[in-house]
Every structure is written in structure tokens, then in C-alpha cells.
Amino acid sequence: MAPNPPDRPPHSNWRDLPNWPTRRTVLEYTGATATLATLGLLGGSAAAQDDDEVGADDTDEDDGETATDDGPAYSYWLPDDPRELEFVAVDWVTLNEYASDELEDAQPDDDVPAEFEADPMIAPVSEGALSAYLFVGLDLAQFGLGRLLDDGEMFDSTVSELLQTPDTYVVLGDIDPAEIDERLTAEPAAEFIRQLEQTDEIDGYEVYTPVEDAAGTAIAVGDDALVVVDDEAVDALAVLESMIGAARGTADRAVDDSESFAWALETAGGGDVVIGQLGAPAGSAAAADDGDRLVDFAYPELEGAETIVSSLTIEDEETSTGNFAAVIDDPDETALADVLGASGTDQSVDVDGSRVTATATWDEEDVAVARKM
């Protein structure tokens, strides 16, 4: 079981206590800059040491989705947004098998090597993975779904992938709509639990909204996905329609409207944890104005990048690889080579006009040495 948050009394269900801290507080507490390489390659879970190689199959057996030449399956859920787009995508099957213990046991005093924090291919992806993981325990707890990732202990529904954007959270997998309905519509068992009721339907998904009117909150439930919107600043139903429409092919997708984004996804979007942005350039005034961004690529070397996709893939119990793709106005190849994948080995950085690609590898031995320095 994960440790209690600081300054909180011991409680067996501390994730579900009413005065739960903000996502930012918890990210800081769990060490948001702890890298996936550190989480996975140091003290890897026993599950990761099975004979079966983790992450070797791109086919998702749980929900039947398969990455195609047109892009990874999660990309179908990313609608064309006239503003900007940020996302975090997690192959939960792989991450759960490999690093679930490390995700839960991360401590605030974990020493993270400075070179990891300074590497755009490591820190942002790691923060994204933790954000997606913690969203379920934090944000979904208010709907009675806070333990959805707990390996069948509380739910018959199973999770294969997680997708987070600033407006929405998508749980992909084998979902039992009746089970979710029972949780959402149940009489609240605690003060902080919000009761919902079925009020609408969108393209085969049953839509639930709070019994007590709350702007910006709606949950769509289907047998292959659970789509959550909980942001009072948006029209929740419109957001659901846009995202479900993209997934069903009845609304425009970001990948279809942007050649640079499609290229970046094809190049670097196939990892076990993937983050990306399309829109406000990294380091721009528009990006700086948003102090709570989902994806943080605020590195001087990436200033002016309008499209970025970065991913980490778990190859086995000892090795992770990273892939990076960006479209940057007037990129500085020397400066980029100093940071992209610099904390790993087998580093490669290539600049072709405005297109930048990079790859690197992180091995258990290298990570262990870095943490001792």
C-alpha cells in the first residue's frame, strides 16, 4: 500500500478521504520528476521479471484496439482543437506489469539525478505518467471510481490504456457499463462522493451528470471506454461529443488536420508512455500564461516548438528506450544534442529543416550509477 500523504492521519483508504490534496500537491509529494527509467529500472516489480517480455506486442487484447500505419489507437480519441492540444497516453497493461509498485512507493525525498531532470526526453514523460496514474485515484474517487486500476480487486472492468488531456480523461479497456452505472448512481457513502444520474446518450455511450447541478461535469460510459469531463470552465457535453465523435470517426481528429502532428505521432508516438502537444509553442508567452499545464516542455532548447511528441518504451526488465519528434522553428542542433537523451546511452539527434528527431536508451546499470553520483 502506498504511504499516507504528509500531515495526514493514517487511514487504510486515504485515497478516498474527503479533503484530498490537489493534483499538484500529490505530484510534488510522490516526486513528479522521478523518471520512468528510475521507476522501472531500479527495483523492478516481480511481474516484470516473468519470462514473457513486456511491451513486445502492439496489439491491445483487452479492448481490441491495434496501432495502425495511420497512428497509434489513442490518437483516434484526440479531436481537432482550434486552440491547442496536450495529451498523455499510457499503456496501463505494460506499466502496471512493470512499475506499479514503484509508482505507489515513490517518496518525496527520492534523489533524482540532475541529468534526468534536465532531459526533455525523461522528466516530462515521467510527470505525464504520474499525472495519468494519479488522476484515477484523485479525481475519479469523487465518483466512486478511485480504485479502478486496482487489478480486479474492486471492479470487474479492466483497464488497458489511459489517455489524459486538459479537458478529459479516457479509460480504455473492457468496461462493464452496468457496474459503472451502479457506482455512479449509488447513494453517496461519504460526503465527498458525488452522485450522478443518466441524462443523455452520445453515439452509443450513456452520459451521466451530477444529480446536484454542476457545470462542466459529465461521464460517458461505453463497453470499450469511460470518458470523464470535470472542468467547470468547459461545456462538458460538447467536449464529450467532440472526443467521442473523433473516436467514432464522425468528428475531425487532430491527426487528420495537422501534417506535422501526424508525422510526430508516427515517429515517436508508439511508446508505453507518450506525451505531446500541438499549438502554443513551447516557451511562448501563451504557454507561460498557463501555470498548470498538463505537459511541460519549457526547455530553452525547445523554444518555438509548435509540435512535440515524446515517449518511453519498456523493452525488458533492464532497458527502456525513448523516442522524440518535434517541429521547431530554426532549431539549434548543437544545443538540442546537449539535452535530448543526454542522460541515456546510444543517443542520436537528427535535424532535418524544422523537423527534429532523437532516440536514446536507458539501462538499469546506468540509472543506478547516476543515482549514486
Can you say where each PLM-predicted feature lies in the sequence?
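Soluble, non-membrane globular domain cores that form compact, hydrophobic packing
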Residues: 2-167, 172-373
